[in-house]
């Protein structure tokens, strides 16, 4: 099970606690943290284990209850005291840039360490600076996500992706609470920048903070045949990349290229693409670098509308991609995302028909 913050209520090997709760105490379980790509990593681990002949069936899942996070400092620990002092200069540079006192440039060009502790919003602003992506372009993409999500929900296109959840008071949750129907360009354009006085990233062109969980079953073809099950798709290849933490939003570019190389494919072979919408700016930069047409990208909206519960997003996007591939009767799909700390992950799926 993927979880980006496996502490507090998420702690104590959450995956194992869930397995025991489900009556599966005879099934081993592990909680995996690769920040935003945590549940993609669980899928990759299952894929590798099956290919190595070390298992046949895995539940690849992820969860994040962002609303339940406790302030790290509430435990009596100053977060600053946990940071490596070697990054003090990098943190000070980030603070100057955030205050609009300095323009971002890659510190590695000066032989300096990048800021490993940098806030994600600051990395988005850095990508906007590096790639000259305007506020208007970001707002337009954010609006696109909301409108596509609104249309998909209204037409029942994502109903099969959602498992109803019954709350303690008996309320049954059957729909995502993130999308904002009726969002207009005027409303999005009126929002102030969040991270820098002169910034371009707003609440309208980045993902909201949500709670969520998602899961997929990954199984060998041998076991599926034994059980009489028909797989939806097969995993073709995966890819992982590393970039400077200060421009982590560009991680999907190299990760996708590596996955495509491992699969012996080109981006032209891919029918549908899901890039996690942590920030509009990093999706724009990524799809432009990769040469992806918009009519193939996030066709039912993305995290700007639905949210990004970090540990669960990889599995959620996989279900979204599989659903869209079925609805459009296409063969190949690419899922990719940036990862806090300066990484990227990608996974290629092929429908089994």
Annotated model-derived regions:
Residues 97-102, 129, 185-250, 254, ...:
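Condensing-enzyme catalytic core mediating Claisen C-C bond formation in acyl metabolism
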Residues 30, 34-64, 72, 128-157, ...:
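Active-site-proximal alpha-helical scaffold in enzymes
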Residues 6, 122-125, 236-305:
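Active-site pocket-lining segment
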Residues 137-226, 289, 294-296:
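N-terminal extracellular/periplasmic Venus flytrap/periplasmic-binding protein-like
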Residues 1-58, 63-85, 162-175, 246-247, ...:
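Conserved beta-ketoacyl condensing-enzyme motif
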Residues 57-126:
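Flexible glycine-/small-residue-enriched beta->alpha junction loops
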Residues 3-58, 115-118, 182-208, 289-316, ...:
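Conserved catalytic cysteine-centered active-site region
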Residues 14-18, 42, 120-127, 143-148, ...:
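Short, well-ordered amphipathic alpha-helical segments that serve as non-catalytic structural scaffolds
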């Amino acid at each position: 099970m993927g979880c980006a913050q496996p502490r507090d209520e998420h702690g104590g090997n959450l995956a194992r606690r869930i397995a025991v709760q489900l009556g599966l105490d005879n099934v081993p379980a592990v909680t995996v943290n690769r920040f935003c790509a945590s549940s993609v990593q669980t899928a990759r681990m299952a894929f590798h284990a099956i290919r190595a002949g070390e298992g046949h069936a895995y539940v690849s899942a992820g969860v994040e209850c962002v609303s339940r996070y406790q302030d790290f400092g509430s435990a009596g620990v100053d977060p600053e005291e946990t940071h490596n002092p070697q990054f003090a200069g990098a943190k000070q540079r980030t603070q100057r840039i955030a205050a609009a006192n300095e323009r971002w440039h890659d510190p590695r060009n000066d032989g300096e360490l990048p800021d490993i502790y940098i806030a994600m919003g600051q990395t988005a602003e850095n990508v906007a600076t590096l790639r000259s992506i305007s506020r208007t372009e970001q707002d337009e993409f954010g609006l696109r996500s909301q409108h596509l999500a609104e249309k998909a929900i209204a037409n029942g296109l994502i109903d099969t992706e959602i498992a109803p959840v019954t709350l303690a008071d008996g309320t049954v949750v059957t729909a995502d609470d993130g999308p904002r129907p009726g969002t207009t360009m005027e409303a999005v354009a009126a929002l102030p920048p969040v991270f820098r006085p002169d910034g371009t990233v707003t609440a309208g062109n980045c993902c909201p903070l949500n709670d969520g969980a998602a899961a997929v079953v990954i199984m060998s073809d041998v076991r599926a045949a034994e059980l009489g099950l028909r797989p939806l798709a097969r995993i073709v290849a995966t890819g992982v990349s590393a970039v400077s933490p200060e421009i982590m939003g560009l991680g999907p570019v190299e990760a996708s290229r590596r996955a495509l190389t491992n699969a012996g494919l080109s981006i032209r072979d891919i029918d549908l693409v899901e890039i996690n919408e942590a920030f509009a700016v990093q999706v724009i930069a990524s799809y432009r670098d990769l040469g992806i047409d918009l009519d193939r990208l996030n066709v039912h909206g993305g995290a700007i509308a639905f949210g990004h519960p970090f540990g669960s997003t990889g599995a959620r996007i996989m279900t979204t991609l599989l659903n869209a591939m079925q609805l459009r009767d296409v063969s190949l799909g690419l899922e990719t995302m940036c990862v806090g700390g300066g990484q990227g992950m990608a996974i290629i799926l092929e429908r089994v028909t």
